[in-house]
Amino acid sequence: PRDNQAAISAGLDFLFAGRRHHNWSDFSALQDPSDTWVTAFVLAQLAQIPADWLGNAREQQVRQSLEWLLSVQGSDGGWGFNLRAESDAESTAWAARALRGCRLRVPESAARFIERCRRSDGGIGAYAPESPSGRAWSIGSPDVTALAASVLGSSSGAPGRAPDPAATDFLRSCWLQTNRPLPAFRVQSRFYTCALLLELEAPEGAWPVLEKLCELMSWNKADNAFDQALLLRCLTGLQIQKSASVAAGLRRMQRPDGGWPASALITLASGRASGSEMGQSDDQRIVTTVAAICALAQCKDVASPVKMGGI
């Protein structure tokens, strides 16, 4: 298998080769594949890796994709799974995090849209309660809440503000401190909410998250590339030494073309999905690959590309 630097470099080659018309698209087996949500997810992941890994040409491509993302914001302030889909809080939060991560101003209308998806329990639902989809999802979703909490805590895009307190209270009661946590809205990975929640907690304050991660690991194996990438993000965030062996396992899963096997599973939970759309993987391998790249780049044993001669 490749070392970390070579794995990240090959992964970026694969990722940018799959970019079309200023955006990324995946889940092509669906009747309406995802372009908006996938592009927002990719850009948010790329914003978390050192800029030196990208280089000037790819940074320019990222800026073009950010401009595309801004251009397709809905009139309600949100973004959806694709250009035709109803706006939802998860897609909107990923778009906001992509913009903020690249030091662009997050439109206030985006935070207002997410706030409209607030539920009485303090959590954030995927859709506004008054929408047809929102009426089918009357409670908050832990993954959407964890993702949106930092956006609401810094709605102007300014870093350093505390996460939304009502959202964090919901996460404690409905995910951290229960043996029957609420299910995720879209991304079906046992480590997804945990990885998002760790981005709200400093390592020294993350003992409840560590306990939940240990619980998840006790009865779940990270047996696919997407789960392995999210597990690596969790272990790195908690500064656990096991991250080095998990990173090695993730590198062994990389394909010769630089991508990782399709394993990011989603469910279209709007209530309008056909049976064939209830559990689809990223057949273009974009989502799994960018998750793996980001996890490896953040792993503590990755040397700086500047010190290693660059990519």
Task: Indicate residue ranges for each PLM-predicted region.
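An alpha-helical repeat/solenoid feature that recognizes helix-turn-helix modules
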Residues: P1-A10, S25-V62, S75-S109, R119-A166, ...
